[in-house]
Amino acid sequence: MYNNGDFHIHSTYSDGSLMPSQIINLAKKWDMDIISITDHNNTDGIDEAIIEGKKNNVAVIPGVELSTRYKDCRVHVWGYFKEDIYKNELLKEVLLKVKKQRIKDIRRGFEDKIDFCGFKNKLCVQTGVVILR
């Protein structure tokens, strides 16, 4: 069983100031035994965190913070992954398009499968949840 953790941490792969390995070392120093890296719209730092976590006995739950919209408000949706689902190439491609604000490209690939809630250039919360499922 885990005793102390943080499930919303950003690394230098988004707007954080520490590399994933530095985050693990700091978590260990602060007696955390479980964390999740949830960078904005990418999963690039997770492998580094998992490797460093194993060295330091800190469990790492792979995660991401997806940028979406609800009406006129920005809403971040957190997704947490079992095993290595975060390495899925389609997911990585979609996250890259969200990061580069190329929602039109996502619409072309998924328009018949996902409801985009009337947005043309943004992801609604509902779409974000479907993508992370």
Which residues make up each language-model segment?
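Extended substrate/RNA-proximal surfaces in nucleic-acid metabolism proteins
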Residues: Y2, K54-R133
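An N-terminally biased module of ancient metal coordination in phosphate/nucleic-acid-related enzymes
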Residues: M1-C73
